[in-house]
């Protein structure tokens, strides 16, 4: 029963999050830009070195998957992208424009919807 409740809650959160992302063009652009520039290292699934490194660093205290994080700030995302961190390279404005970086920032710092955010049918 608990497992079914957990699965139902996860499905609700994902569908509500998708609905809100579709309503926000900046978040959609951020998703597409993240998939193009960042997902090779920071995507979901095995074989993504950034995700693996962050999971090892945080040891379960925070998710290794950036898209699942709730603690990211716009300033932190911009800093990491423009200056690089550890083995992550920095990205120039000619690679990721300021507008694209703003979209990535909006995508990664979006918050999951609450019940009041989701429109009832």
Feature-to-residue mapping (PLM):
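Bacterial N-terminal signal peptides
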Residues: 6-15
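The canonical Cys-X-X-Cys-His
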Residues: 30, 34-45, 104
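Methionine-biased hydrophobic packing positions in alpha-helices, especially
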Residues: 88-90
